[in-house]
Amino acid sequence: MSYTGFVQGSETTLQSTYCDTSAQPTCDYGYGTWNSGTNRGYENYGYGYGYGQDNTTNYGYGMATSHSWEMASSDTNANPSASGSASADSVLSRINQRLDMMPHLETDMIQGGVYGSGGGERYDSYEACDSRAILSERDLYRSSYDYGELDPEMEMAYEGQYDAYRDQFRMRGGDTFGPRAQGWARDARSGRPMASGYGRMWEDPMGARGQCMPGASRLPSLFSQNIIPEYGMFQGMRGGGAFSGGSRFGFGFGNGMKQMRRTWKTWTTADFRTKKKKRKQGGSPDEPDSKATRTDCSDNSDSDNDEGTEGEAAEGTESAEAMEKGSRVDGEDEEGKEDGREEGKEDPEKGALTAQDESSQAKRKLQASKKSQDKQKKRQRDRMVERIQFVCSLCKYRTFYEDEMGSHLDSKFHKEHFKYVGTKLPKQTADFLQEYVTNKTKKTEELRKTVEDLDGLIQQIYRDQDLTQEIAMEHFVKKVEAAHCAACDLFIPMQFGIIQKHLKTMDHNRNRRLMMEQSKKSSLMVARSILNNKLISKKLERYLKGENPFTDNPEEEKEQDEVEAGALDEGAPSEATELTEGVPAQPPVPLEPAPGTTTPPPPPPPEEEESPVPLLGGALQCQIRGIPGLDMEDDEEGGGGP
């Protein structure tokens, strides 16, 4: 009677056809129908090799092509429906031939064919054997079959070249693979049925040799893709079939050992040098270097089979240290030579440095002298500007032209400021300030009459303030005229339409009202700072007594103008303090001479003691950048002012 069963693998589907020659009952374990009679061989099974994917010759052992069992084309193209013992015997004879070749493959694996330079880049060759030679007479296919019930002959199967592996991995199971490996090792020694299979399998890096995969409820098919049962805890390892992940444990499969060997080769000597030095410090001085190196390197390895590799690493470490010592000696010699050269060149370098210092000092002196000259010129220009420029101290208004000053005195802006000051100060004090501004304007007119070429002087002042004259034409930079709105902090092109449009905007009207209130408050602070001056306070006392305080000595008036200019420059609450502190430094007022005696006029004060007075006060200077004749602070910064 003929039955057909199917074995489902991860990649291929194998159709198994056999002929049942006995009348004994059968048990289906999912791998076809297995005979449970006394015949425990594979002689009664006929296997067809009809595959659904391109008739490949790889039968699912998870191996590279070089380690696969290649079948002849006649076998591959056999009729799937054929039955009979002849075809089964021919197939099994070919399988037994492959099995007889396994001892030769084992010898090659021990000599490095798999653990380092095997033909397969990913998996080891499938290690199998004829289970009939080593198993007892018990039922091979019983589901509760386990390692604990093997015959002594089964244990003898391990005697040979793998004894060292078995003992070493049993001792290192917990150290290398963590808690899970310790559990497997304990279960293997304690004789638990299920865990002992796992522990034995992982402690002995032999694949499935001599074991025929016991510990599972079913025997795997010889052509099944999953040679090792699929258990969730093993997913993530790398090998054949169920082990689809990376080679974390580093043994049992050729690729893991190969990668570890490559890792050994890629390690640098610096990894061993530090540990070796620590070992030398902590251990005895008589301990050889190779022993210390091997002890340190064993911590980084996953297998104890790399003695040759450790020897290579030790030799590489010693050679690297020798090279390092040689390089250190050479480096010390080179450093000594360089030190000698530096000592020999020390005096010439000092001389060169001295010359450089002298040249730098000379340049600094030239720059300082140039700055002092520019400062002196600027100071003279500022003094000339003070004499010919009209100034309204409370409104912070300055102009070179007389008609503009008259218009300002009659403007609403000027009157509102004085009205605000009158509300904060006594009426007589406010009237004194009004008379003070009027008298100052008259004195400025008298000084302007003494100047021969007033218009030329004004033009010269404007030219000096033009910083674009020093810029070459290839830079295409020139001076332009623009209107500056201090309330909006905005520069406007000098075009009538644009200016009128800006004046009608809502933002400008809101900002100008706020600016007006701020300007009034600032004018009050300026008025108080002026009145706090001792000379002006004496004039105020005389004015309150009904006398004319503006007919005093011209030199006294000059000092008062300078003090007032300082107050205008600040325009802040600190102005009063600065003015009161600067009063003692001023020369005292000369006494009136007795009648009938003549005294020479007092000498003018030196120019160095006078503080420069810019065209505009500090409060407005930042708001009128670029306006001709008013940008004195910018000129000070460009000319190297204090």
From Swiss-Prot:
Segments of skewed composition (Basic and acidic residues): 288-297, 338-350
Residue positions, PTM Phosphothreonine: T268, T293
Extent of motif Nuclear localization signal: 275-280, 363-365
Compositionally biased spans, kind Acidic residues: 299-315, 553-564, 631-642
List of residues that carry Phosphoserine: S284, S298
Subunit architecture: Interacts (via N-terminus) with DHX9 (via RGG region). Interacts with TMPO isoform Beta, PRPF40A, RNF43, lamin-B. Interacts with HDAC3; increased during mitosis.
Biological function: Could play a role in constitutive transport element (CTE)-mediated gene expression by association with DHX9. Increases CTE-dependent nuclear unspliced mRNA export. Proposed to target PRKACA to the nucleus but does not seem to be implicated in the binding of regulatory subunit II of PKA. May be involved in nuclear envelope breakdown and chromatin condensation. May be involved in anchoring nuclear membranes to chromatin in interphase and in releasing membranes from chromating at mitosis. May regulate the initiation phase of DNA replication when associated with TMPO isoform Beta.
Protein known as: A-kinase anchor protein 8-like
Organism: Mus musculus
Lineage of producing organism: Eukaryota, Metazoa, Chordata, Craniata, Vertebrata
